[in-house]
Amino acid sequence: MANHLLEEMVDALSSLPGIGRKSAFRISFHLLRLEQGHFNHFIHQLTNTKNKIKFCKRCGSYAETEICNICTSEKRDTHTFCVVEQPEDIFFIENTREFHGKYHVLNGVISPLEGIGPKDLRIKELLERIEPEQIKEVLVATNPTLEGDATADYLASQLKPLSVDVTRIAYGITVGGSIELADQYTLGRAIRSRLQL
């Protein structure tokens, strides 16, 4: 490509997760066609959000203040925690409108191959919240990967001595999915997580 500035813009956009080069080109061309005022507003919003969003000092989620809205809400179930890998996982769980407790973000999972152990995660902070916040149940919502499962097992071993119910989100066949298309791991997990009817 002859235009180096455009190429640099495409490279920057395609470094974002889920955006390939083709999408990066489309976004770049769209941004170049924007009216200058609209473009400036877009850039201002990106910069403003990046500068003002921080991490909640209590749960580790994204927040505009020291403590996020979920942690300060009096409408939430204060005795139930949902433990997630990353702050963005909270957004997806909240969209289900099924969980009404509070959260705790680990900032990753145990991964010996990547040199990440329990001390590299926010597990100590989780354990320190249990007694003062009178937590009765911890729902572990790590991803259904080997690392996510190892992290869930480790959390259970640390939490059970504290007289806390430790639960795990169920995994299985996608609604509308087919057993023949499910991989062996997912199908096995669905069988182990079966429910009483």
Swiss-Prot record:
HAMAP family: RecR
PROSITE patterns reported in the protein's UniProt record: RECR (PS01300), TOPRIM (PS50880)
Domain Toprim, first and last residues per copy: 79-174
Entry superkingdom: Bacteria
Organism ancestry: Bacteria, Pseudomonadati, Spirochaetota, Spirochaetia, Leptospirales
Protein name in the entry: Recombination protein RecR
Assigned keywords, A-Z: DNA damage, DNA recombination, DNA repair, Metal-binding, Zinc, Zinc-finger
Provenance organism: Leptospira borgpetersenii serovar Hardjo-bovis (strain JB197)
Residue intervals of every C4-type zinc finger in the record: 56-71
Gene3D superfamilies the record matches: 3.40.1360.10, 6.10.250.240, RecR Domain 1
Function: May play a role in DNA repair. It seems to be involved in an RecBC-independent recombinational process of DNA repair. It may act with RecF and RecO.
InterPro entries: DNA_Rcmb_RecR (IPR000093), Rcmb_RecR (IPR023627), Rcmb_RecR_Znf (IPR015967), TOPRIM_dom (IPR006171), TOPRIM_RecR (IPR034137)
GO term, biological process aspect, one: DNA recombination
Chain's gene name: recR
Similarity remark: Belongs to the RecR family.
Keyword NADP applies: no
An example Gene Ontology molecular-function term: zinc ion binding
SMART domains in the record: TOPRIM (SM00493)
